[in-house]
């Protein structure tokens, strides 16, 4: 029931201006683009497509996925106006059915941290399935300051769980606009496949 309510709220937010939809790509993504050759990228939880458009404009072949149909509708309008080619799909990040890799980059600006804990393992299985060996996962998320804290955010033990199949290239801790603890992570999948 809680998951259904969250889905409704996300869909509803896209009838206005969601607080996370700034229309500006973050410097972490821009730095990544500047320092890596274009390849295939997936924007998981792409919203209205701002970051997918940034990637496509830089030469990446991009797929954007979001579970909110309204977000994908708005993204299609923005993509059309930008004159770029992006595959946009209404998909749940814990399933990603019909999306095949390999992707050189999976980008996630606040999607993973909002998934209910029991869905995160499914998300990570999908990520492992679609990410190319040597591929990157650039992810932003809120952090939990207490191990048993409820709500949106990642606990340190969850970051440790990710490290069982991805290598941490860098981590940048900080605070969001509301002074909530958050971090950017750049993970890389090893060249040899790891089962999770």
Enumerate the predicted regions with their spans:
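Short catalytic micro-motifs in class I SAM-dependent methyltransferases
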Residues: 110-114
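Class I (Rossmann-like) S-adenosyl-L-methionine-dependent methyltransferase catalytic domain
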Residues: 1-42, 48-101, 115-126, 130, ...
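A conserved beta-strand element that flanks and buttresses the S-adenosyl-L-methionine
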Residues: 107
């Amino acid at each position: 029931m809680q998951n259904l309510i969250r889905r409704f709220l996300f869909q509803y937010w896209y009838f206005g201006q969601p607080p996370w939809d700034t229309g500006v790509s973050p410097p972490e993504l821009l730095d990544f683009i500047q320092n890596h050759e274009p390849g295939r990228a997936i924007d998981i939880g792409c919203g209205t497509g701002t970051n997918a458009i940034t990637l496509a404009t830089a030469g990446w072949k991009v797929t954007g996925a979001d579970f909110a149909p309204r977000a994908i509708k708005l993204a299609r309008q923005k993509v059309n106006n930008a004159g770029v080619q992006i595959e946009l799909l209404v998909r749940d990040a814990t399933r990603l059915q019909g999306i095949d890799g390999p992707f050189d980059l999976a980008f996630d600006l606040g999607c993973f941290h909002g998934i209910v804990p029991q869905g995160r393992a499914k998300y990570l299985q999908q990520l492992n399935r679609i990410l190319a060996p040597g591929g990157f996962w650039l992810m932003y998320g809120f952090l939990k300051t207490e191990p048993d804290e409820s709500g949106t955010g990642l606990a340190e033990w969850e970051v440790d769980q990710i490290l069982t199949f991805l290598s941490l290239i860098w981590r940048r801790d900080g605070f969001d606009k509301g002074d909530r603890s958050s971090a950017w992570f750049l993970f890389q999948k090893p060249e040899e496949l790891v089962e999770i």
